[in-house]
Swiss-Prot record:
The gene is PTP. GO terms for molecular function: double-stranded DNA binding; single-stranded DNA binding. Heterodimer with the polymerase; this heterodimer binds to bp 9 to 18 of the genome. Interacts with host POU2F1; POU2F1 binds to the auxiliary sequences in the inverted terminal repeats and tethers the pTP-POL heterodimer to the origin DNA thereby participating in the assembly of the pre-initiation complex (POL-TP-DBP-NFIA-POU2F1). This is Preterminal protein. It holds the Pfam family Adeno_terminal. GO terms for biological process: DNA replication; viral DNA strand displacement replication. The modification O-(5'-phospho-DNA)-serine is found at residue 575. It comes from Bovine adenovirus B serotype 3 (BAdV-3). InterPro entries: Adeno_preterminal (IPR003391). Transmembrane segments: none annotated. Residues 400-409 have a biased composition (Acidic residues).
């Protein structure tokens, strides 16, 4: 007789998944969390815990004075680990874990912030029918300073065309590439303070605490979630890094291709050398990228032929907008670094390029060293049972008063337009190969806003020292903001495990401009609530600062100009002092020496309770002894002090739960 195996218990599967998520978000090993046995809802199980361990007020007291959760949560809290030897853990994990707290600290620590500060942990209790839970929340404030004086020296007002060409190399490089490559060099840089600690102990060696969990790889192996997660991100990032680097090279090559041609209506018989004959074969795109991508030879690309700022800016906007359609039609480009044969195999050159485009694009993508590339396989069409005859189309005569419609033929593309179409197709397909996290382009569209601002200055004839200085400074400020917000969005919103358990409540960016003496000249504040705070902040800041550029050098604004300016920057209530905003618009930016950028965000996450009876029993004894010390006005022991716990006294009977008696 055969016995059928019963299916796995659904609750056990959910429990293991919860323990796995908790391990990733606390930096602990899976073994530690399975020993801890996390529980979110303690409804009808409150009697298993000490009274102080289940209320928001009690956990707040334990967190700040007894267990010191702000720093304890950063340690290796596995059984019999050095941090758990004596007071207050006694060889076991703590009675609570703040799910996601260690992850937030790690994310902030891994970026190039000069200072990191965390507000006091706040606990909120929710008790309703069938639910009793506790949440923790904190506000992180991470900041660093930009040396604006360096940007002043960067500007060459006598040769602004050359300055623009230098800027575009950094713009087209897409800071997201550097962001994904930011793995080791700047980790742990700067200072970290926690408000829950006494002043003399607020400077916390976070990096040392976080690395303690990964010191013995032979012991923890892939269960050291903090370390393994970093390795996993690094490995996944290499593939995205190759794709993003290729996209950058394509955009740079296309921009340099546009610059390589003399401006319209200029007779220039000098030709660049060497010549490149197109379409020499199906793989002309590879030769195109090798010829025009950085590093480039300015002389061979004839940068001196770029006649006007407007032309350079238009080319930058065109390259930045790839793979979207061009904002303005391209004029036919002749000469330059290409020798265009009028016909090949009986077809026009542009027609041949268009016909071969799909094959050429596919070969170019296949040539990239992408690990485990997801190849697209066309699905075969389902076989039809019998061939159906083709329907016969009858030509219907036009109705009375109706004119015959003539077939519209699309106008033939110029050579430059066909080059753009091929480059755009490659970029579009490569973007589809990116992971979701690396596909966040909403943070890097700010460059288009700023180049449109330059276009407006050019049309108004307002290119002067004040507007150019502000444009350059604000451009690089927004570049910093975009890179940082994208980093935070990547880790705090696009991480599935973190987003599933921890909520982003608020995002805020504060910008303070200082003079040479360190005095604040003006400050700006942008706030956005909700889970999409970072992307909404980026959109507002880009629009705001780009709209402020053309107000530079105009002195005091009258009432009508102020109203128009507030409309241009899409001002919202509670987004900074209006007088500060007006002062920023009227300021001479030459007095700005440095700019402080602060990134603040508030998160709320769950408190997990232990279900392990021994951890609950130790916690009762620790709470009892700590309460006695508080009543006797004695200081609390330090972590791992060899304190002998007194025996547990019986607790007073709790009144049974039921309806409250009327007063």
């Amino acid at each position: 007789m055969h016995h059928l195996k019963s299916p796995k218990n659904v609750s056990s599967v959910c429990f293991l998944q919860s323990a796995r998520d908790c391990a990733r978000l606390t930096g602990q090993t899976l073994h530690t969390m399975e020993l801890f046995r996390p529980l979110r809802n303690i409804w009808n199980r409150a009697r298993e815990y000490a009274r102080a361990a289940i209320s928001a007020a009690g956990i707040s007291w334990m967190s700040r004075h007894v267990y010191r959760y702000p720093t304890l949560m950063l340690r290796n809290l596995g059984a019999r680990q050095p941090a758990t030897q004596n007071w207050p853990l006694y060889l076991y994990p703590p009675p609570h874990f703040l799910i996601g707290y260690q992850y937030v600290v790690r994310v902030c620590n891994d970026y190039v912030f000069e200072t990191r500060a965390y507000s006091r942990l706040v606990y909120r209790e929710t008790v309703r029918l069938d639910q009793q839970i506790v949440d923790w929340s904190t506000m992180a404030n991470c900041s660093y300073t930009i040396n604006a004086g360096a940007y002043h020296r960067f500007i060459d007002l006598e040769n602004f065309d050359e300055t623009l060409r230098q800027i575009q190399q950094a713009v087209l490089a897409e800071r997201v590439v550097a962001d994904l490559a930011l793995i080791q060099p700047l980790r742990g840089f700067g200072r970290t303070e926690m408000a829950d600690l006494p002043p003399q102990r607020r400077n916390v060696p976070v990096e040392r605490f976080l690395q303690e969990q990964c010191m013995n790889l032979g012991e923890c192996q892939d269960q050291a979630w903090g370390f393994a997660n970093r390795i996993r991100i690094q490995q996944a990032g290499r593939r995205d890094l190759i794709i993003l680097t290729t996209i950058r090279r394509l955009r740079c090559a296309y921009f340099n291709f546009l610059l390589s041609h003399p401006p319209p209506n200029r007779n220039n018989t000098e030709r660049a050398s060497p010549m490149l004959s197109l379409p020499c074969d199906c793989d002309w795109l590879e030769a195109f990228v090798q010829r025009f991508s950085d590093p480039v030879d300015a002389q061979s690309l004839r940068f001196e032929t770029a006649a006007s700022t407007e032309r350079v800016v238009a080319h930058v906007i065109d390259a930045l907008s790839l793979p979207q359609p061009a904002a303005r039609p391209l004029t036919e480009l002749r000469g330059g670094a290409f020798e265009l044969r009028p016909r090949e195999h009986g077809r026009a050159v542009t027609q041949e390029m268009r016909i071969r485009r799909g094959e050429m694009v596919q070969r170019f993508i296949e040539s990239l060293p992408l690990p485990t590339r997801r190849r697209r396989v066309a699905r075969p069409a389902p076989p039809s049972p019998s061939p159906s005859p083709e329907p016969v189309e009858l030509e219907m005569p036009p109705l009375e008063g109706e004119e015959e419609e003539e077939e519209e033929e699309l106008p033939p593309r110029s050579f430059a337009e066909e080059v753009r179409a091929a480059v755009a197709e490659v970029i579009r397909l490569l973007q589809e190969e990116l992971t979701v996290s690396a596909r966040n382009e909403q943070f890097f569209n700010f460059a288009v806003d700023f180049y449109e601002a330059i276009n407006m200055l050019e049309r108004e004839g307002n290119i002067n020292e004040s507007t150019i200085r502000r444009w350059v400074i604000y451009f690089f400020i927004v570049e910093h903001i975009a890179t940082t917000l994208n980093y935070l969005h990547h880790h705090l919103r696009l991480s599935p495990v973190f987003a599933r358990h921890v909520e982003l409540n608020l995002g805020q960016v504060v910008m303070r401009a200082r003079d040479e003496d360190g005095a604040v000249i003006y400050s700006r504040v942008w706030n956005e609530p909700g889970t999409n705070a970072f992307s909404q902040l980026m959109r507002r800041i880009s629009t705001d600062l780009a709209a402020t550029v053309h107000r530079a050098g105009r002195g005091e604004l009258d009432e009508e100009e102020i109203e128009r300016f507030m409309t241009d920057i899409a001002y919202r209530d509670h987004s900074g002092d209006v007088e500060e905003i007006i002062r920023q618009a009227e300021l001479n930016d030459a007095s700005i020496n440095s700019v402080d950028l602060s990134f603040r965000f508030k998160v709320t996450g769950p408190v997990a309770f232990t279900q392990h009876p021994e951890i609950q029993r130790i916690n009762r004894r620790v709470v009892q002894h700590a309460s006695d010390l508080r009543q006797q006005l004695q200081p609390m022991p330090e972590l791992n002090d060899p304190v002998q716990l007194p025996p547990l006294r019986p607790e007073r009977q709790r009144p049974p739960l039921g309806p409250r008696r009327p007063l």
